[in-house]
């Protein structure tokens, strides 16, 4: 039975919602009234483009205006991020946020902006596990054997990454610290050349997003030792979690959506609901699963909380590794 107090509280909440919606309608009679720019701060291709284009197409269909993907790569995502922060806070310029934003806050001491103050969280999109892959000729078949081999051969292992300061690089640094092993870090310009050299034996291993390596594992061209999330990946179900051996080890990549700070909360709320609805669509969910990713759900405040947690998590890893942008 609903009490009088509960009824009055619900009525007040409903009235406040109606008032906010009315104010939104007066100040923003038809958002969106023209095309919306969705900035991806990376070069075309890969999971970032697939996820962005999936969501932009669905938002275009649902909201009646075109959501256009604009790739603005450079400086580890900083160029695109800074461009969005400098844009008008009107909902017509959005940013595909990522792990790089959480890392750069502490990795780059000369960062020309404050991400936490410059971007309004809109919605989470997906989380992607990483996987430790090694050359097939390396005489190890598990995380425990890899650690034992590294300890028995200090400094002889080389581990690739997609670049200094990336989640792939820092996952390796965290692994080194937690496992008490040493190996040489070899940065590449992206995952593809690093994976190529792991397959050839030029380097012995690599932490990589499952999205770009699972097919090589399935084809038998690489050996997967463990995923970096606490749970196994649906796309590599036979690969255990690294945390099963190295208790407490956990990293991943994530993607979300942000807007310039001071974007009206009504617009943020609308976009959040539409993105969340899109992520619940069976077709989109399947496409995300096929990438090896996990859809993220929740309101804007929850995504903001996740960004805060991720930034703090990666700050600890950066401090532990001592790595800084030069």
Describe the role of every protein-language-model region.
Residues 1-14:
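N-terminal secretory signal peptides and thylakoid transit peptides that target proteins
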Residues 3, 142, 187-190, 209, ...:
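Short loop/turn segments at beta->alpha junctions
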Residues 86-91, 106-193, 242, 254-287:
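Hinge/capping helix and adjacent helix->loop/strand transition within the periplasmic-binding protein
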Residues 96-101, 161, 191, 207-213, ...:
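Beta->alpha turn/N-cap motifs
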